A protein has these predicted regions:
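N-terminal small-domain helix-loop-helix segment of the aminotransferase-like
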Residues: 1-30, 37, 87
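Short acidic capping loops at alpha-helix termini that bridge into adjacent secondary structure
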Residues: 20-25, 45-48, 95, 156-158
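Conserved PLP-anchoring active-site segment centered on the Schiff-base-forming lysine
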Residues: 24, 41-63
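A short helix-loop-beta submotif of the ANL/AMP-binding
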Residues: 64-71
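Helix C-cap/helix->beta junction micro-motif
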Residues: 66, 126-127, 156
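Active-site phosphate-binding strand-loop segment of PLP-dependent enzymes
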Residues: 71, 75-146
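Active-site PLP attachment segment
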Residues: 152-172
């Protein structure tokens, strides 16, 4: 299949309530490359990226490579590993360029309720930074596929990362 055919099939597969067209799909050699491309496009030296703890180490590695700062927000095990939105709000600064959200989360297994997802999207929209939605495990949640965060606000600045290898249990 051609790249255009692949993009069309990915757009159909990932839509789930988000109007998807091939011009909204970027093919990369893996999610890691997509994350690196997005961060390099969005972040300048000295900027800040809000990153959950625990996190996927690539986010902090790429942020450091850009000479930007990873600002960690907590996910609370006492609250099902959900992010503390008030704490995230307190960590934001004029240099904040992105908010990383890993949902479903690895390694915690947390799947965020729509109310939390909406609050996170609202933060990004209101304060002018991009929400990086790491949704690579979206097809592997115990309760069935997790709808993309972007469906909650089609105008919000959301970049969603998916992974066919994770969806088909063939990572590596």
């Amino acid at each position: 299949a051609s790249a255009d055919e692949a993009k069309a099939r990915i757009a159909d597969f990932t839509a789930r309530g988000v109007p998807m067209t091939t011009d909204r799909v970027v093919l990369t050699s893996g999610t890691s490359e997509g994350i690196e491309i997005a961060l390099n496009a969005l972040v300048e030296p000295g900027d800040e990226v809000l990153v959950p703890m625990p996190t996927y180490p690539l986010y902090t590695a790429v942020t450091a490579k850009i000479a930007a700062k990873a600002v960690y927000y907590r996910t609370d095990p006492a609250c099902g590993w959900l992010p503390d939105v008030d704490q995230i709000r307190s960590l934001m600064s004029p240099r904040t360029r992105a908010l990383v959200v890993i949902d479903p989360n690895n390694p915690t297994g947390a799947v965020y309720p729509d109310a939390v997802r909406r609050e996170l999207i609202e933060l990004a929209s209101r304060h002018g930074f991009v929400l990086l939605a790491d949704e690579v495990y979206g097809d592997l949640a115990y309760d069935g596929p997790t709808p993309p965060m972007a469906r909650l606000d089609l105008d919000a600045p959301v970049i969603s990362f998916g992974s066919l290898s994770k969806a088909y249990l063939a990572p590596g």
